[in-house]
Swiss-Prot record:
Keywords: Cell membrane, G-protein coupled receptor, Glycoprotein, Membrane, Receptor, Sensory transduction, Signal, Taste, Transducer, Transmembrane, Transmembrane helix. CDD domains: 7tmC_TAS1R2, PBP1_taste_receptor. Forms heterodimers with TAS1R3. Belongs to the G-protein coupled receptor 3 family. TAS1R subfamily. Gene3D superfamilies: 3.40.50.2300, GPCR, family 3, nine cysteines domain. Pfam families: 7tm_3 (PF00003), ANF_receptor (PF01094), NCD3G (PF07562). It is found in: Cell membrane. This is Taste receptor type 1 member 2. It comes from the Eukaryota. Residues 588-602, 657-681, 749-760, 806-839 are cytoplasmic. InterPro entries: ANF_lig-bd_rcpt, GPCR_3, GPCR_3_9-Cys_dom, GPCR_3_9-Cys_sf, GPCR_3_C, GPCR_3_Ca_sens_rcpt-rel, GPCR_3_CS, Peripla_BP_I. One of its GO terms (molecular function) is sweet taste receptor activity. It comes from Homo sapiens (Human).
Amino acid sequence: MGPRAKTISSLFFLLWVLAEPAENSDFYLPGDYLLGGLFSLHANMKGIVHLNFLQVPMCKEYEVKVIGYNLMQAMRFAVEEINNDSSLLPGVLLGYEIVDVCYISNNVQPVLYFLAHEDNLLPIQEDYSNYISRVVAVIGPDNSESVMTVANFLSLFLLPQITYSAISDELRDKVRFPALLRTTPSADHHIEAMVQLMLHFRWNWIIVLVSSDTYGRDNGQLLGERVARRDICIAFQETLPTLQPNQNMTSEERQRLVTIVDKLQQSTARVVVVFSPDLTLYHFFNEVLRQNFTGAVWIASESWAIDPVLHNLTELRHLGTFLGITIQSVPIPGFSEFREWGPQAGPPPLSRTSQSYTCNQECDNCLNATLSFNTILRLSGERVVYSVYSAVYAVAHALHSLLGCDKSTCTKRVVYPWQLLEEIWKVNFTLLDHQIFFDPQGDVALHLEIVQWQWDRSQNPFQSVASYYPLQRQLKNIQDISWHTINNTIPMSMCSKRCQSGQKKKPVGIHVCCFECIDCLPGTFLNHTEDEYECQACPNNEWSYQSETSCFKRQLVFLEWHEAPTIAVALLAALGFLSTLAILVIFWRHFQTPIVRSAGGPMCFLMLTLLLVAYMVVPVYVGPPKVSTCLCRQALFPLCFTICISCIAVRSFQIVCAFKMASRFPRAYSYWVRYQGPYVSMAFITVLKMVIVVIGMLATGLSPTTRTDPDDPKITIVSCNPNYRNSLLFNTSLDLLLSVVGFSFAYMGKELPTNYNEAKFITLSMTFYFTSSVSLCTFMSAYSGVLVTIVDLLVTVLNLLAISLGYFGPKCYMILFYPERNTPAYFNSMIQGYTMRRD
């Protein structure tokens, strides 16, 4: 005997020993094709190991489950509505056989009963393709644990099973459960709706309470995985003890509840997510009320989100805001009246077609218990009943197709389970304006709703405040919620408040939601999309202030014409240019006079021309540096200035030689005069300066560079040289040496004839140049900010003025105002007087 045969043999034995008689017309309706219904009319949360006693539990001994009876009536209503519909299954009567499964305690016996023949036998066969069971399909049960138990049996026979409220993601596995479908979205969508609700209200610090069964464990784990990817942290997770509402708690169970509520009180989290069957929560909420834990937001899973009995604990309104995830509300016309009429609403009780029957088909108190909650059930929009209603219609449409029905008749024939299953997978119809079809996982994509519990009798007790659409995986239509807070403010549930813009997170503890907020320093920014825990440095050409999320381009700073310092220096340069040009004209008109010739003659025109060129180079300091302007700054201007200073130095040396060294070294002086010593010296100095300039340009380059202003980092200074101070020292080193030489020779000639004594003027010019250059280098060694360029230009213009006015100015003064001293006779008399004094 193979494994399959052994399984069937075991099922036959169980069926034979477990069957007991019971009968109630509310549970049975004869018909051409029977549907099996599994509903929790009573609830035993702990279960019973009843197989050890070979005895089926008596469900009527347990707590009545109002919603379960309501769902059973939805199945009865759907069957009777279909039987009265001439367009669907014309000429065919659907029947049903309904069993109370006591939540999880009574699942095996009913499914064996549904699978057996009328004689309660399950024959051993190699092939069950042609096997005919008592029912053609099973609707239910209501929870995932029971559904898996039942599906393991029904899948062996490919007998269609449609559950209306089991949400476990395990049920999507069609290899394990090929005959299982459901008319409710899976746990994946329920959890996603919860998470999107938390994200919408910025709740990232939550508490999770789960029941100790598979439902609580699986959904708690799924929520933990989902929130971890959304930066939502679980402060703690606790398992609630499994308790019956009418059951006395043990001391351990009571202490367990006290401990859990104590942790709720001490936690800073104010959002509590509860995955638990409804009946296990009565003792828990009584303890919450006893300890007066208020101000929380309670998020209910679908198992208790619309439970009317739990809602009847009106004191819960003081605990905070209750939100629940449940199936969308689809009103079914006529159902409320059908439920209120009870069994009498259906057709008269009929005799069974055979003497086969099963147990747990009685519920004496169900109708009265349901009627006591009739108002709340009606106002709540009859939620979930549509899932049962649509499941029955899905089977009916599949039968309609399988039997080849037309508008008036159907071909009644034997229906095998696997044939009906194939047709159910294909159904696609509209029921009360909703499209019903099964996706590849066997689910119907009905919308979910977020409901808020209300205790105002004039309102819907489960008021819809948002909708979740499984196909788009989006939470939409979020409405205003009546928060049980001061001024109706949205409750806060965050371990740490959100950091402000430009603040990085510093983790505190093990939870990513707990952190300190630290400002990003200037020059750094926070990129939330890349790293919220580290501030990134700005690129070199950008800057940021403290606490920024982006950098901005640094302000490029250079001399501009509209600035006051630039205008002032430009006016000085213009004054120097005009005065130098005037001096050139004066010297040209008095070229043959002794003063001009004693000042250097042709050499004066070279100096004045170079000074004019230097003044004309001043504008290249203004505006953004370019290669051409940098070339003028680093080559043309230094060269012009060096030649001018070298002329002064050579002229000083020449005068000293003529009066003091010619008599002592006549031969050397004759060579100096014969071989044009002054011009050779100037040419040598010029070549040396050109070498220095070329070396400097090769070392630093001509391309403009930028550097950050140390006093204001948001400013970038554009200059021609990346190492401005060293370049200035290198470029002016020869000029400083020449100024010292010129000053020395001028000082040596202080006793020369008055007309040749230029010590005062050369000393003034060279001393000013030397002092200003040293001061500029000192200033630049201590400061490298935006003022360097303007100070450098100012010193340059002042040095040019010192030569133009300090050296040539006195000579022009003598030419213009003392013409009698600009004669050969006067100069000869001065030389004779100097010679006589020496003798």
